[in-house]
Regions:
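N-proximal low-complexity "stem/linker" segments adjacent to membrane-targeting elements
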Residues: 1-31
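Short acidic, S/G/P-rich loop/turn micro-motifs used as interaction or catalytic elements
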Residues: 15-20, 47-49, 107-110, 136-137
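Glycine-rich, basic loop-to-helix element that forms the pyrophosphate-binding segment
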Residues: 79-95
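Short beta-strand-to-loop acidic/aromatic patch adjacent to the donor-nucleotide binding site
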Residues: 99-109
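Acidic donor-binding loop at a coil-to-helix junction in glycosyltransferase catalytic cores
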Residues: 195-202
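Single conserved hydrophobic/aromatic residue that forms the stacking wall/gate
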Residues: 205-214
Length: 214
């Protein structure tokens, strides 16, 4: 049974530059669709849509729910060499109609309870912003293969990922749950950061503290 995250929208900006990134995009999207009743917006910015050609057919084959029920895919054609992640995020934030928006990285999978606890904390008005991991703790870097992620998706057993992972620092983490109104009122993402970089995540965390939204 899927957990109810119906008042959350996961916004996932992507540019698929490698087979590893393609695998990660498929894995994280399938994981969210299979485990949560939620909303997803994926926006790909590139010359051509790798997601539409390579990922969508696989997702339609392996995911056992109607993937189009609460899923929106957008491709914006662009020849820009830099992936302007913050601008893409802001465009997707403005599309959100749910109480919670999740700035979500396509390379991240969290323990299932991390999603539900973050969601509940915001819906219960305990928090405005939740970082499910990070803050000086650690993350697991997974050396995934197609076989590994297939077994994980089929069984939901995190041990398949743990077996091929190592501990690594996580800083502020690449996934944040926001109360949507707070995210918008706070100015959303700083588009002066024009590429994919950890400074942008650190800035978001610092701004949340300075405005009292933590």
């Amino acid at each position: 049974m899927r957990a109810d995250l119906s008042q959350a929208t996961f916004i996932i900006p992507i540019r698929i530059e490698s087979p590893d990134r393609l695998r990660n995009v498929i894995t994280t999207t399938a994981f969210l669709l299979e485990n949560f009743d939620t909303n997803i917006i994926i926006q790909e910015v590139d010359k051509q849509s790798v997601f539409e050609k390579e990922a969508l057919p696989i997702l339609e084959d392996i995911v056992e729910v109607d993937i189009w029920k609460n899923f929106n895919f957008i491709h914006k054609k662009s020849d820009e060499p830099l992936f302007h992640r913050q601008r893409v995020l802001n465009e997707m934030i403005m599309e959100c109609e749910t109480d919670i928006v999740v700035n979500y990285d396509c390379d991240v999978i969290l323990p299932k309870e991390s999603y539900t606890l973050a969601y509940k904390g915001i819906m219960d008005n305990i928090y405005d912003v939740v970082y499910p991991y990070g803050q000086g703790m650690f993350q697991k870097q997974v050396a995934a293969t197609d076989i590994t992620v297939s077994k994980f998706l089929e069984t939901g057993d995190y041990e398949f990922l743990n077996a091929v992972s190592k501990d690594h620092t996580s800083d502020f983490g690449w996934a944040q749950f926001f109360k949507t109104s707070v995210y918008k009122e706070g100015g959303m993402e700083n588009e002066n950061f024009k590429a994919y970089a950890p400074e942008a995540v650190s800035y978001t965390h610092l701004r949340a503290h300075e405005t009292g939204n933590d």
